[in-house]
Structures are given as structure tokens and as C-alpha cells.
């Protein structure tokens, strides 16, 4: 927390942890660990991955107290603040929402309802963090619970994370959901990706260095990041387009981050000069942003070795 917010209310955060530990005393998670390890992990996600404020971290530590203990909105309001109490109560209300339909129209209505119920956007952010930690520790639940929660996550929480521009969380939520919705398919893709990663490690490093060098020559200040596509995006492409993994050519992605819109287009020109672009695969999300206001340029190119 100190790294991004040196003036955070550390005394209040510590007090919230002590309050949560006292109220969850005697409660355990499915793996046998003290229950308080869960709100602590959620607070860690809120702080380290989302860089939210003190009130959000405190509310994350307390997010299950109204739902699962004798803590009250009034008491939390007095001990911490009315805003923290409202955040905790907001998360509790979202927790009580039940998912009964698999119809896409009903799912979309439910997503809209959850967004509307969260009068403060931080409620949704804490709830997504809560779901992310639960998915990270889902192996201790029954197979039935695993599939139920994974379906909810895939259909409700991952799309909301996408709308809020939380791409990394969206990807992880999707991958963790796939792990339980189709264990065999997930495992096959993970094993194949591990093989591809070992096979193409040198290739990715070479491309990274080529791009970095050309941008430096052009005087463009940029950060170049390389990654393999995440398992669910590959799974979806394989099953919706009836392809094998060997038929999915865009397994790797490079992200180039620059400071200006002009440099985005300059970088695109350099990339297309270095590698052959595939027709019909260019998307301009700067000129036409996505509904969540995501802006970037996307292109698919063919490397020197194909």
C-alpha cells in the first residue's frame, strides 16, 4: 500500500483487520484455514492489484462481517465511517443475489442489476476481488459448487470486469472458471501452451528485441510486453471455430505502451514495416473505442518464420 499511497490510513486498516479477526474467530474455510485469511486476501487484491483507497481496503477486510457475524452497519459506521459501512453492506447485498437462469437475456439483466445495486463502484470492485480469491481457492469446494460458482463467474463477474476495463482480472476469472467447467479441455490447453512456450521462448525474445530496437531508433519512448494468449481465449477460438491448437496462429501477443495517440499510429507503421500484416485483422479502438472506453490499436502479423 505504501508504494502507491504513502498517506493511507494504516491505523484504520490494522483496526479493520483486528475487528474482522475477532468477529470471524472460530470460523474456518473449507481448507481448514482461519476464515479471516479470506478477507485479508481480498484486501490484498484490492490494494496490490487495484490500488484502491483506504476505505476500500478497510471495507474489503470487513466485507463478510455483516453477512456472516453479528456485526452491524451501525457499529461499523461508528468504528470506521458511514462510507465504509455502506461499502460493506453493498457487498453483502450483492452476495445475496441468486443466479437461477442460464438464458443470456436474463444474465444481461442480472449484470445490469448488479451494477445498478452498487451505488458506489467500489462495491463492485470489492465483490469482484472477493470472487477472484474464492475462484483461486475453489479446489476445496465440492464438484457441484465448483461448477455452479464457475458458471456464475464466467457469465456474470468476468463480463462485468471486462466492462470496467479490468482485463487481467477478467482473463484470470475466465481461466479459473474454465478449469472447473471443462477440466479436460483446460488441462489439454495448459499442457499444449507449456510446450509451445518452451518451443517459442527464443522467438518471443527475438521479436521483443527487434521491436524495442526499432522503436528506440525511431525515438519513440515505449514499453514492450510479450505474453501468450490466455487459455480461455484460445479455448473459445478452438471450439467456436472448430480448430485444433495447431490451427490457432495468434498464440502470442505483444503490447506496446506509448505516451501519445500519435505514437500509437507511429508504432503501428513500424510493426507493419517489420512484419507482414494479415488483411482484415486490424482494429482501431482509438478512433472507435469499445463500450468500456478501452482504446488501442490491434493488428495481427506474420513473423519471419511464419
Give the location of each predicted region.
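Active-site helical microenvironments for divalent-metal-assisted chemistry
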Residues: 1-253, 257-306
Amino acid at each position: 500500500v505504501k508504494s502507491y499511497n504513502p498517506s493511507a490510513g494504516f491505523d484504520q486498516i490494522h483496526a479493520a483487520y483486528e475487528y474482522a479477526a475477532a468477529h470471524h474467530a472460530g470460523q474456518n474455510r473449507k481448507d481448514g484455514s482461519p476464515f479471516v485469511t479470506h478477507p485479508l486476501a481480498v484486501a490484498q487484491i484490492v490494494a496490490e492489484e487495484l490500488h484502491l483507497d483506504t476505505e476500500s481496503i478497510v471495507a474489503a477486510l470487513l466485507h463478510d462481517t455483516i453477512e456472516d457475524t453479528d456485526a452491524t452497519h451501525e457499529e461499523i459506521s461508528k468504528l470506521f465511517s458511514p462510507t465504509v459501512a455502506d461499502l460493506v453492506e453493498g457487498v453483502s447485498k450483492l452476495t445475496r443475489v441468486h443466479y437461477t437462469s442460464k438464458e443470456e437475456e436474463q444474465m444481461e439483466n442480472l449484470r445490469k442489476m448488479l451494477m445498478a445495486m452498487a451505488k458506489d463502484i467500489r462495491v463492485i470492485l470489492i465483490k469482484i476481488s472477493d470472487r477472484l480469491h474464492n475462484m483461486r481457492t475453489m479446489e476445496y469446494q465440492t464438484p457441484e459448487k465448483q461448477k455452479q460458482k464457475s458458471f456464475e463467474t464466467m457469465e456474470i463477474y468476468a463480463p462485468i470486469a471486462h466492462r470496467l476495463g479490468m482485463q487481467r482480472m477478467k482473463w484470470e476469472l475466465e481461466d479459473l472458471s474454465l478449469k472447473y467447467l471443462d477440466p479436460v479441455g483446460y488441462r489439454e490447453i495448459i499442457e499444449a501452451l507449456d510446450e509451445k512456450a518452451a518451443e517459442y521462448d527464443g522467438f518471443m525474445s527475438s521479436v521483443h528485441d527487434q521491436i524495442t530496437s526499432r522503436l528506440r531508433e525511431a525515438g519513440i519512448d515505449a514499453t514492450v510486453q510479450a505474453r501468450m494468449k490466455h487459455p480461455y481465449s484460445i479455448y473459445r477460438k478452438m471450439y467456436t471455430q472448430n480448430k485444433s491448437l495447431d490451427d490457432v496462429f495468434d498464440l502470442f501477443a505483444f503490447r506496446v505502451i506509448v505516451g501519445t495517440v500519435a505514437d500509437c499510429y507511429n508504432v503501428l507503421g513500424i510493426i507493419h514495416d517489420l512484419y507482414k500484416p494479415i488483411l482484415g485483422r486490424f482494429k482501431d479502438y482509438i478512433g472507435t473505442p469499445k463500450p468500456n472506453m478501452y482504446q488501442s490499436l490491434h493488428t495481427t502479423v506474420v513473423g519471419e518464420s511464419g
